[in-house]
Amino acid sequence: MFCVIYRSTKREQTYLYVEKKDDFSRVPDELMRSFGTPQMAMLLPLDGRKKLVNADLEKVKQALSEQGYYLQLPPPSENLLKKHLAEQGKQSD
């Protein structure tokens, strides 16, 4: 199984995985509008692979077979104030 990964032009660190190059037929229109013009990032073989860097391999495979796409969102931003206060033994309000 192969997938094609596209980078969003509207949302930083957001990627769309599809089964075939330039085939967005199974991706909802609303998602495509909010994603922007897809920029191809890479073609990736999924078979024989044990893991992906920022996505769960099994979830990607399942989403591709069931819905035809997988959307990878950026990791949540770190709350530096909360982290600093935790290190100081305090709580933020």
From Swiss-Prot:
It comes from Klebsiella pneumoniae subsp. pneumoniae (strain ATCC 700721 / MGH 78578). Gene3D superfamilies: YcgL domain. It holds the Pfam family YcgL. PANTHER family: PROTEIN YCGL. This is YcgL domain-containing protein KPN78578_22820. Disulfide bonds: none annotated. Residues 1-85 form the YcgL domain.
